[in-house]
Amino acid sequence: RSGMGNELNLVPVDKFTQQSKEYSNVFALGDANDIPASKAGSVAHFEIDVFVDNFLQYIAGKDMTHRFDGHANCFIETGEGKAMLIDFNYDTEPLPGRFPAAGIGPMSLLKPTRLNHLGKLAFKWIYWNVLIPGRPMPISTHMSLAGKRTDLISAK
């Protein structure tokens, strides 16, 4: 153990930049940090997109201007050949609606459907043939409210 972790052995970081709160030259991503977000693979993927831009600024001695918004999305198997899809971030809880994914088409949010189950199965191919080789994903790093039932967001 590095001794950088908190009582849960997670590195305390700025949730927007993943920069350590104690060591300015350390960044912790994914399962290693204490951000208030899911430990889903999508979170690590979106964090890394933001981190790369910030790290290039950091090593050039510039201010880090990119911010991770806590974006997470994942399929949840619900049984009987159906799955739900959720999409959320630090500020917005999962909302019902449609998830517009370029080239894939609309998928239902917070609703068990066969299409979502098939999307989850297709993601295995996307993982190995798009994500692992480092090809860009057709999903924005920052959460979009497009297609979501924003009328359900309560005023804070």
Over which residues does each language-model region extend?
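C-terminal auxiliary extensions adjacent to catalytic cores
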Residues: L85-K156
